[in-house]
């Protein structure tokens, strides 16, 4: 790898000669492969070294073809770079009761799924992505993760100014110059320049200033980048504390994790992951608590009432008008504890959303573009209600409401390619929940001689390649591999 000369000079000055040489050497090595297991869905033993700052993070000995593991598509794990799993450590340290949290720059969903896994029950996660072409993969990954206390939005950071004091926690994994991704992304190396570092720093400050109002006084800001330089890291943390008003907080870490602290003359705590010291990619994180001086922020509900212009005009393409319809009890009973949900019909979709968050959700809908919320139970088609894939993925689905059919590995891959499904002749007609290793993959409608594949078209596996099943099973214990033979 040929590093930009300006990058080498600047990083050498930041790290010193010895650390910089070790970093250069580390960037020539293969990046480690790691996953984070979804313990709410899967209790299968996964082979590998544990990521020390993550309860369910695991390093793999080599990179399997994840695309061809049905359990990957079922949301049993997320392929995530190990350093960024440190967000979990922050939330475990500072969040012990239910919160409303915003992940501002969330796609593709690694930190959102990590946050959702450790947030206390009763917390609401709002995962936002400003880029329209990236928000769908964010929604897909959160749907697969299976938690219903989630809202996915597609908004500019400035839009959140209309929600003052709404969030207890805001995570800003801001767009950056990408120095920490050099060994995984050749484009990041090609596009790097000292000028771009300055552009990124200014963009990051704009994003932070835009969202600051939405963080309640005393709320927690998690600031992170995947870059090394001080301009986007320590200098921005100092700017937040000084200009926006915040205290920098410490996160307990173990010395054997080899996380690097502040590399400037300042003494506030920060957490920098360097590839030659920690097993992961380049990553930087700091935690700040917003000052409470000056009184409470104006409540969001009062703000919206007084600033009606912030609301979307429902007659001009704003929030879709809900149909007046009673959702059948048998559909509500597709969920565990249906009494805990509010049910509504949006277009042709039947959506369930946790009642405890309905007031917050109503406020979000007034100012944000909501892509996904709660769980979509099904779609109205004439007199029929077709169960939605979101229902198959949620951990809130009531077991036993649908007949199940277990698929072989080859059948599961065929289903995920959206190929025709052939079921055993003993299986009755109707909607069938298809499983692999007893984990739900999705629905099919059995019509007798064949079954209509209801897997989402846009999520299908497009490759026709079929690997040796044992190459997939390197993820799991020997018992799991034996099952797959």
Name every feature range the model reports, one short phrase each.
Residues 167, 220-223, 227-351:
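Class I S-adenosyl-L-methionine
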Residues 120, 215-216:
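Helix-to-beta-strand junctions that scaffold the AdoMet/dcAdoMet cofactor pocket
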Residues 108-120:
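Conserved SAM-binding loop of SAM-dependent methyltransferases across substrates and taxa
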Residues 139-162:
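S-adenosyl-L-methionine
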Residues 133, 171-210, 222, 226-233, ...:
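Mobile active-site "lid"/loop adjacent to the S-adenosyl-L-methionine
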Residues 1-42, 291-478:
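Polybasic, low-complexity RNA-engagement segments
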Residues 162-169:
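A short acidic, Gly/Pro-enriched loop at the edge of an enzyme's catalytic core
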Residues 98-105:
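Conserved class I S-adenosyl-L-methionine
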């Amino acid at each position: 790898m040929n590093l930009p000369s300006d990058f080498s000079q600047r990083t050498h000055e930041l790290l010193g000669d010895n650390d910089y040489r070790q970093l250069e050497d580390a960037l020539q090595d293969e990046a480690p492969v790691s996953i984070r297991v979804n313990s709410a869905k899967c209790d299968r033993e996964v082979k590998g070294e544990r990521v020390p700052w993550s309860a369910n993070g695991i390093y793999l000995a080599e990179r399997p073809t994840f695309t061809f593991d049905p359990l990957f598509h079922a949301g049993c794990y997320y392929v995530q770079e190990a350093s960024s799993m440190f967000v979990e450590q922050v939330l475990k340290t500072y969040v012990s009761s239910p919160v409303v949290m915003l992940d501002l720059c969330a796609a593709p969903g690694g930190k959102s799924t990590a946050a959702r896994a450790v947030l206390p029950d009763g917390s609401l996660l709002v995962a936002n992505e400003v880029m329209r072409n990236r928000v769908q993969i964010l929604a897909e990954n959160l749907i697969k993760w299976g938690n219903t206390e989630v809202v996915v939005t597609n908004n500019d950071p400035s839009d959140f100014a209309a929600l003052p004091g709404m969030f207890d926690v805001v995570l800003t994994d801001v767009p950056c110059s990408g120095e920490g991704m050099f060994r995984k992304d050749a484009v990041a190396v090609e596009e790097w320049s000292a000028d771009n570092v300055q552009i990124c720093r200014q963009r990051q400050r704009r994003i932070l200033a835009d969202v600051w109002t939405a963080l309640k006084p005393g709320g927690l800001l998690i600031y992170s980048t995947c870059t090394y330089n001080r301009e986007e890291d320590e200098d921005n943390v100092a700017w937040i504390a000084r200009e926006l008003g915040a205290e920098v907080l410490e996160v307990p870490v173990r010395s054997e994790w080899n996380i690097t602290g502040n590399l400037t003359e300042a003494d506030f705590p920060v957490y920098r992951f360097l590839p030659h010291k920690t097993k992961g990619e380049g990553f930087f994180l700091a935690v700040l608590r917003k000052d409470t001086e000056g009184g409470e922020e104006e409540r969001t509900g009062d703000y919206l009432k007084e600033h009606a212009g912030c609301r979307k005009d429902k007659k001009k393409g704003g929030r879709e008008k809900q149909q007046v319809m009673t959702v059948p009890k048998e559909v509500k009973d597709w969920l565990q504890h249906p009494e805990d949900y509010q049910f509504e019909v949006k277009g042709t979709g039947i959506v369930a959303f946790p009642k405890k968050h309905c007031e917050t959700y109503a406020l979000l809908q007034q100012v944000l573009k909501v892509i996904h919320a709660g769980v979509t139970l099904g779609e109205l088609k004439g007199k029929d209600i077709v169960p939605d894939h979101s229902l198959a993925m949620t951990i809130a689905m009531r077991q036993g409401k649908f007949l199940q059919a277990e698929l072989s590995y080859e059948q599961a891959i065929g289903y995920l390619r959206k190929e025709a499904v052939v079921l055993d002749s003993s299986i009755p007609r109707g909607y069938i929940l298809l499983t692999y290793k007893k984990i739900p993959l999705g629905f099919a409608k059995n019509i007798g001689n064949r079954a209509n594949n209801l897997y989402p078209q846009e999520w299908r596996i497009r490759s026709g390649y079929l690997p040796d099943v044992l190459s997939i099973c390197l993820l799991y214990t020997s018992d799991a591999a034996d099952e797959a033979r």
